[in-house]
Swiss-Prot record:
Any one of the GO BP annotations: signal transduction
UniProt-annotated catalytic positions: C717
Gene name, Swiss-Prot/TrEMBL: mpl3
Its EC number(s): 3.1.3.16, 3.1.3.48
Extent of Low complexity compositional bias: 1-10, 90-142, 178-195, 224-243, 306-323
Domain of life where this protein originates: Eukaryota
Identification of the protein by name: MAP kinase phosphatase with leucine-rich repeats protein 3
Any one GO CC term of the record: cytoplasm
N-myristoyl glycine lipid sites: G2
Swiss-Prot/TrEMBL catalytic activity: O-phospho-L-tyrosyl-[protein] + H2O = L-tyrosyl-[protein] + phosphate; O-phospho-L-seryl-[protein] + H2O = L-seryl-[protein] + phosphate; O-phospho-L-threonyl-[protein] + H2O = L-threonyl-[protein] + phosphate
């Protein structure tokens, strides 16, 4: 669980502790990293391969923690590749501290320091240093002895002096080597003991003092005995020096002084060696004996200021202690209370591990952290843990576990629980006391084995979202509409055959009951959108709406040449306008009476209910005001249907609607029922603006027309939005003589979700211009043919000079006028045809007048 520290990122700047090496210089995962998610603190233990949670995993946060912004992390797990801009400053500070420590170690002979540092060469992988507190008497004796040795060494030149100098150089070289090793060596690995982490802490933090607890009396006695032996040795050496100086003559003082210096150095070196072997191995002896309990005293204010200025590491007041039995850090009640007032954790993620249970110790720590969101998904829980100990929980996620029962007793004791997610388990039933979770708002138990729902589920009056999809439900509770606050319901992929009353669900926004076995659909959903109907129709200009209706009604009307026929058409249009206004007002009044005006339904998904063949009439009134996702295709005009792929794979619905032809506008799809229906496929059809779909217009229009005459035709693509709608619009422009805007409005009124892509729209506009030009050319050609016929008739009338000549010419002119009127009536579909027909009629009348004059 520890971290591997590298020297490049300031690896020796942190101190190990707890279950993993902490510190600010690292590039991997930190055990004490807290992610700041917009003011909400998050701990991520996701995908760590944990089989059991231990208290020391969380006790590291009692010692120190580091708050990291989410934008400084690269991946979404919040645990890798943290930015380490601050590590350079820390590494430089640590290097300066190490240099100052080395200088202090070299100058201990001249400085009157209380703390003495010594080094040893041990067999461990990391060098060790200790901080000892010496009594004042021993310090004075050491100072006097060291001063004597310095003077004697400077005055002497014997082989003993050279040995002493060599010994000092060796010790200095050892210090240099060890200090350089400290600079380049990483922090102890996670496999090393907790004692080594404290040793590295002593190496890097020289201001710390070490005290021993009263429990370790044996160690105290040993240290006292060592100090007494050192004091006795120093006293004996001083007495020998005084006696030798008094006994010898003045003539031999120099020689005696030299000899005394050598003899005086020996006990000093011996004392130094004893001090190395007795005082320092307090940590080395711990390899064979039990380690001593130690407590590190830290200045809270200074450390917090330094941490906030340099690295975002925050150190609480009380740090962890080392356990002498197992060598692991533990926490006490005081540290927990201090952490509780220091920081609060909003969410904890323990997903994608191998957890089977959570002990009460861990749950009590979670309670002290006041965790609100707990994620335990993708583990091996067979029984829900005792989460009632964490009273602050608001969200619990137990997705992808091995739960077979829903133990509501655990969640009833959580007063703040609002969201419960139990997806992808093996739960077969919901207990009757589910309504005791009073504040539950979001409940998701999808992809389980539920077969029925208790009636008490309807008592969850605060429930907003309910997801029970992908189960084995066949019915819903009869009082299901008592859940008056429901806004989103997902019941897809079940076996539901009928629905209860839904009239009270006035706050419902989304209802998904796709992929079931519905036999009928209640009309209650149509009455859950009356408020939107009122609002939408109150903003509609009825006269403007009537103009659009008139354009559709006048599609198949013929333009008569006489003024009487025009007046009759205007009268008929006025009657149609009055009827349309009355229909709109009747629809608004009917919805006001039946609906109540409180619904807000936006989407109803009834797709893939193969037994559901028809919809109630009420849904026709609101199909443009809500998104109705269904497998039933939309009927644009009688005999022409528009839909998606789900409409084409339901043979019973197609046969019920009388469809015989299917136009398939998908490049990578084969016909579903080639033996039952007649297909026309566009193999390379792509929903892309650069694709030229206009090259198929002439052929598809002929196929649609033949299918409409034979019974019905379905035009579909994958979603029934772009490709299929483009083909239907082109057909309406060609055979129903509509403009692009008229055809687009008509199709969109029948199927609101259609939307041809911009490239297809441009192609339809070009096709409109092409059709307009061809119509004009056809009209002009008809007029020229009529003129030729009139001139030939005039020549015949001139040659006939009989008494009834006038009557014959009048009859011929009347016949020609009748022929022109019938031809023009067949071609009068565009806005320009009335003018052209009038011109042709005028020309024919003038020709007849000329005939009359000529005959006279």
């Amino acid at each position: 669980m520890g971290n591997s520290h590298s020297s490049e990122n300031g690896g020796n700047s942190g101190s190990g502790g707890g279950s993993g090496g902490g510190g600010s210089g690292y590039s991997g995962v930190s055990e004490n990293m807290i992610i700041d998610l917009e003011g909400r603190y998050h701990i991520d233990y996701k995908n760590r391969n944990y089989k059991k949670l231990k208290p020391q995993m969380f006790s590291t946060f009692f010692e120190h923690y580091e708050i990291v912004q989410a934008d400084s992390l690269i991946n979404s797990d919040f645990i890798k590749n943290k930015t380490v801009k601050k590590n350079r400053d820390n590494s430089s500070n640590n290097n300066s501290n190490n240099n100052s420590n080395n200088n202090n170690n070299n100058n201990t002979l001249n400085n009157s320091t209380i703390i003495t540092t010594t080094t040893t060469t041990t067999t461990t992988s990391t060098p060790t240093t200790t901080i000892m507190i010496t009594p004042p008497q021993q310090q004075q004796q050491q100072r006097t002895s060291l001063d004597l040795t310095n003077r004697d060494i400077s005055e002497s030149s014997t082989p003993n002096e050279q040995q002493i100098r060599l010994a000092q150089e060796e010790t200095e070289n050892q210090e240099i080597v060890e200090s350089s090793f400290l600079k380049s060596s990483p922090v102890p690995s996670p496999s090393s003991s907790v004692l080594k982490s404290f040793e590295s802490d002593f190496q890097l933090n020289t201001d710390l003092t070490t005290e021993t607890f009263d429990d370790n009396s044996a160690e105290k006695k040993r240290q006292q005995q060592q100090q007494q032996q050192q004091n006795e040795d120093s006293k004996q050496s001083s007495q020998q020096q005084t006696q030798k100086s008094k006994d010898k003559d003045e003539s031999a003082k120099i020689v005696n002084n030299k000899s005394s210096s050598t003899t005086n150095i020996k006990p000093i070196l011996a004392a130094a060696q004893t001090s190395r072997s007795t005082s320092i191995p307090a940590f080395n002896r711990n390899k064979t004996k039990e380690p001593t309990k130690q407590k590190i005293k830290k200045e809270h204010s200074t450390l917090r200021k330094n941490s906030l200025s340099s690295s975002n590491i925050i150190t609480p007041n009380n740090t962890t202690n080392t356990n002498a039995k197992d060598g692991a850090s533990y926490f006490n009640e005081n540290s927990l209370m201090s952490v509780k007032s220091d920081i609060k954790i909003f969410s904890l993620d323990l997903s994608i591990n191998r957890l089977e249970n959570i002990t009460n110790d861990i749950l009590s720590i979670m309670a002290r952290f006041e965790i609100q969101e707990l994620t335990l998904s993708t583990n091996f829980f067979q029984i829900i843990p005792d989460l009632q100990l964490v009273k602050s929980l608001t969200t619990v996620n137990l997705t992808r576990n091995k739960l077979s029962k829903l133990q509501t007793s655990v969640f009833i004791e959580l007063p703040s629980l609002t969201s419960l997610i139990l997806d992808r388990n093996f739960i077969s039933s919901i207990p009757d006391d589910i309504d005791q979770i009073k504040n539950l708002k979001y409940l998701s138990i999808k992809h389980n084995a539920l077969e029925y729902l208790p009636n008490s589920l309807s008592n969850l009056s605060q429930l907003i979202s309910l997801d029970l999809s992908q189960n084995k439900l066949k019915t819903l509770p009869p009082n299901f509409d008592d859940l008056i606050n429901l806004r989103m319901v997902w019941l897809s992929y079940n076996q539901i055959t009928s629905l209860p009353s839904m009239r009270k669900l006035v706050n419902l926004v989304t209802f998904d009951i796709s992929s079931n076995k519905l036999l009928s659909l209640p009309k209650d959903f149509a009455y859950l959108v009356p408020s939107r109907i009122k609002q939408s129709y109150s903003d509609i200009d009825i006269d403007e709406y009537d103009e659009n209706i008139n354009t559709c009604n006048n599609i198949n009307s013929n333009n008569n040449d006489s003024n009487n026929s025009n007046n009759n058409n205007n009268n008929n249009n006025d009657n149609n306008n009055n009827c349309n206004k009355n229909n709109i007002l009747e629809m608004i009044n009917s919805t006001e009476l039946e609906g109540g005006g409180l619904g807000c339904l936006k989407e109803l998904n009834i797709r893939d209910n193969r037994e559901l063949i028809s919809l109630p009439v009420e849904y026709k009134q609101v199909e443009s005001l809500m998104t109705l996702v269904t497998s039933i295709p939309s009927e644009i005009i009688p005999g022409i249907f528009l839909g998606g792929l789900d409409s084409a794979n339901n043979a019973p619905i197609l046969q019920t609607l009388g469809i015989t032809h299917i136009l398939l506008a998908i490049g990578d799809c084969e016909p579903f029922f080639p033996k039952t229906f007649k297909y026309y496929s566009i193999d390379d059809a792509r929903d892309a603006p650069q694709y030229d779909i206009s090259q198929h217009f002439e052929q598809t229009n002929c196929f649609i027309e033949s299918g409409r005459k034979s019974g019905g035709v379905l035009v579909h693509c994958r979603a029934g939005i772009s490709r299929s709608s483009t083909l239907v619009i082109s057909y309406l422009m060609k055979y129903q003589r509509m403009t692009f805007k008229q055809a687009m409005d008509l199709v969109q009124s029948k199927r609101p979700q259609i939307q041809p892509n911009p490239g297809f729209k441009d192609q339809l506009l070009k096709y409109e211009a092409k059709l307009f030009c061809t119509n004009i050319l056809n009209i002009s050609s008809h007029n020229s043919n009529n003129k030729n016929n009139n001139s030939s008739n005039n020549r015949k009338s001139i040659n006939n000079r009989k008494s009834n000549n006038i009557i014959i010419t009048i009859n011929n002119s009347s016949n020609s006028n009748n022929n022109n009127s019938t031809d023009n009536s067949n071609n009068s579909s565009t806005s320009t045809t009335p003018n052209l027909s009038s011109l042709s009629s005028d020309s024919s009348s003038s020709a007849s007048l000329s005939k009359l004059s000529i005959s006279k």
